[in-house]
From Swiss-Prot:
Domain of life: Bacteria
Name by which UniProt lists this protein: Alkyl hydroperoxide reductase C
Catalysed conversion reaction: a hydroperoxide + NADH + H(+) = an alcohol + NAD(+) + H2O
EC number(s) from the headed UniProt entry: 1.11.1.26
Record GO terms (molecular function): NADH-dependent peroxiredoxin activity
Miscellaneous remark of the record: The active site is a conserved redox-active cysteine residue, the peroxidatic cysteine (C(P)), which makes the nucleophilic attack on the peroxide substrate. The peroxide oxidizes the C(P)-SH to cysteine sulfenic acid (C(P)-SOH), which then reacts with another cysteine residue, the resolving cysteine (C(R)), to form a disulfide bridge. The disulfide is subsequently reduced by an appropriate electron donor to complete the catalytic cycle. In this typical 2-Cys peroxiredoxin, C(R) is provided by the other dimeric subunit to form an intersubunit disulfide.
Record keyword Oxidoreductase present: yes
Enzyme kind, highest EC tier: oxidoreductase
Length: 25
């Protein structure tokens, strides 16, 4: 389950709008 996957706040693959997008904020 992606919901329970631990992710880093600045380099993470976020599930957005039905697709995977790389988040680098």
């Amino acid at each position: 389950s992606l919901i329970n996957t631990e992710v880093k706040p600045f380099q993470a693959t976020a599930y957005h709008n039905g697709q995977f997008v790389e988040v680098n904020e």
